[in-house]
């Protein structure tokens, strides 16, 4: 969803190297190098962002992991979104959001929340 939103803009190939949809836990572990365990927390979001940056050879890694419902996942409530960033200077940052709404609303709010978080982090650097 995030890369889809970014590629709606002409010229996006100048700034977007690619994206990885790690919907399954196995892809998080095997492709992105996430430590085994529950996958919806800020540490996992950071590990995903670092892994995406490494795999794609990108300056910045942005990662989202969360629960859109309808049921809890490993005790994490629907609407929970963890965003991780891996920045060019090697620093990382993360944040947890609690999003309202039903599944489709949460998915769209996830994109908005993650891109705004990225924008703010880059502006602060």
What is each stretch, according to the model?
Residues 1-125:
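Short alpha-helical segments enriched in small residues
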């Amino acid at each position: 969803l995030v890369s889809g939103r970014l590629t709606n803009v002409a010229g996006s190939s100048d700034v977007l190297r690619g994206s990885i949809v790690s919907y399954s836990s196995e892809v998080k572990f095997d492709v992105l190098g996430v430590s085994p365990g529950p996958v919806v927390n800020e540490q996992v979001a950071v590990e995903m962002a670092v892994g995406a940056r490494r795999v794609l050879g990108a300056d910045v890694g942005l990662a989202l992991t969360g629960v859109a419902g309808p049921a809890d996942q490993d005790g994490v409530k629907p609407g929970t979104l963890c965003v991780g960033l891996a920045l060019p200077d090697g620093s990382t940052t993360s944040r947890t959001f609690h999003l309202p709404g039903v599944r489709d609303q949460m998915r769209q709010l996830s994109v908005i929340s993650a891109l705004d978080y990225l924008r703010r982090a880059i502006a602060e650097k």
